[in-house]
Amino acid sequence: MKVINLIPTLMLTSLIILTLPIITTLLQNNKTNCFLYITKTAVTYAFAISLIPTLLFIQSNQEAYISNWHWMTIHTLKLSMSFKLDFFSLTFMPIALFITWSIMEFSLWYMHSDPHINRFFKYLLLFLITMLILVSANNLLQLFMGWEGVGIMSFLLISWWHGRTDANTAALQAMLYNRIGDMGFIMMMAWFTIHLNSWEFQQIFLTNPKNTTLPLLGLLLASAGKSAQFGLHPWLPSAMEGPTPVSALLHSSTMVMAGVFTLIRFYPLMENNLTIQTSTLCLGAITTLFTAICALTQNDIKKIIALSTSSQLGLMMVTIGINQPQLAFIHMCTHAFFKAMLFLSSGSIIHNLNNEQDIRKMGGLYKTMPITSTAIIIGSLALTGMPFLTGFYSKDPIIETANMSYINTWALLITLIAVSMTASYSTRIIFFALLGQPRYPPLTQVNENNPYLVNPIKRLILGSIFMGFLISMNTIPHTTPQMTMPPHLKFMALAVTLLGFTVATELNNMTHNLMFKQPSRMHTFSTMLGYYPTTTHRVLPYPSLTMSQNLATTIMDSIWLEKMIPKNLTTMQKTAASLVSNQKGLMKLYFLSFLLSITLGLLIAL
């Protein structure tokens, strides 16, 4: 019992430490660089303290619940602040803190010339805090607060360079697409309020209501918006307009992971609902294939990595769809390490090449930037699921489990194709950015000797190598794993990965010196992201916006300012003038007619 009592105490201590730098900004004006180091140190201490309850949980396997502040009671709906410290939250929190610590240290180098770097660090810290609120929440209200918190912080961080039109547009896209998902989340909250009169997870899961398809569809819509699934995905590659540390934090352990994590939280309701499982599986399979196709022909290094994130999120949705939430969570944790490392490495290249992001203008960087090149190679191999790197311990079991789900053959097939494409575009990054001859200006000064650049990448390299083994060794399977399977199924994940590597290498070598005369339709489809942004952001809104503009500026003005008043007055005046102008104004003729009439009348009277 003493061990269990230590878990909530230490975890709350780490959360309180994170809030201290925010409180200092309210008490005094932090114009010096001390705030940066205070914030980084606070995250480091919080990470060190959070490791203790995680290790205690691994030893005792006892969950802890904290309910320490009652807010209000509305009729019989009790609203309180409560935390759920179980396997998911206690495992994810140290990982998020470790990655944020590395990203903040990297930001000291990457953002050193920004005049508002103190505010930038505060936003990063708030981004982390809202994600930890979401992860540790034990009720829907607290979960919704964290949900909206990561949304607003992503808006502020994506639009950090608000002088750029593209950055503002990308932030608005992220906000609007997430508002669509929030409609589903609010619908789910309303359904549970009406039918269960409770937002506490324990009561919802113990009640286990029937016919939960409607609220779970709302949850799936919310997760699709937050985790950039097909249909609500265009904001994710656009979000690359933000600073690289923002992209690293957003893609590794905060914003996009919130949707998948929420689905994992609600798996007790989903595991017996075949409609939701099938919908999740199909949505994830379509997403992972579509975004992998789009990543194959992109030239922006950050967009390639961003689309790979969306593809991996689709793979996590596939895993949830085949009723393996623990596997999806393990992949979420392992993915965080190498994805953060890939973004930091790309930021190192971009910063050293004077903001050049086109991989066609790189090359030969393995000589001038060996540490960054090593990180990109290890991260790309881990992303593809190369054996004994971090990604292997989650990706290989996912493919094995999917192979055993024989009723979902088409979803398995396109998932395998997407896994092979992952190896292809990862090889393409290595081939164009690191190998060959330099294609950047010869006077470019390349330097990676700064410890704020090198140390975070080194830490993430170690995480990308060893953390998959450590996490998988301390995870209890949700269901009984398949004990036997044919050898060709066992090696399927490795086979499709090697196939992708081989095809990408051969194609790159064959086409390196060829002129690209005219792109094919498939190439254009991939480069234009499946024409989805063009269709949804231009073709469909254009008629309605044009009609609205004409209605507001032309038709309304034409009616009120032209037809109703001036033309009506003109018509009235013309009518009156026509009535008056029947008399021609011939006075002599009128007077003569008058005299003749009087004379004739007098003669007749006499």
Swiss-Prot record:
It is found in: Mitochondrion inner membrane. It catalyses: a ubiquinone + NADH + 5 H(+)(in) = a ubiquinol + NAD(+) + 4 H(+)(out). One of its GO terms (cellular component) is respiratory chain complex I. It holds the Pfam family Proton_antipo_M. GO terms for biological process: electron transport coupled proton transport; mitochondrial electron transport, NADH to ubiquinone; mitochondrial respiratory chain complex I assembly. Keywords: Electron transport, Membrane, Mitochondrion, Mitochondrion inner membrane, NAD, Respiratory chain, Translocase, Transmembrane, Transmembrane helix, Transport, Ubiquinone. GO terms for molecular function: NADH dehydrogenase (ubiquinone) activity. Core subunit of the mitochondrial membrane respiratory chain NADH dehydrogenase (Complex I) which catalyzes electron transfer from NADH through the respiratory chain, using ubiquinone as an electron acceptor. Essential for the catalytic activity and assembly of complex I. The keyword Oxidoreductase does not apply. Core subunit of respiratory chain NADH dehydrogenase (Complex I) which is composed of 45 different subunits. It comes from Loxodonta africana. Its main location: mitochondrion. Its EC number is 7.1.1.2. Belongs to the complex I subunit 5 family. It is a multi-pass membrane protein. The keyword Acetylation does not apply. This is NADH-ubiquinone oxidoreductase chain 5.
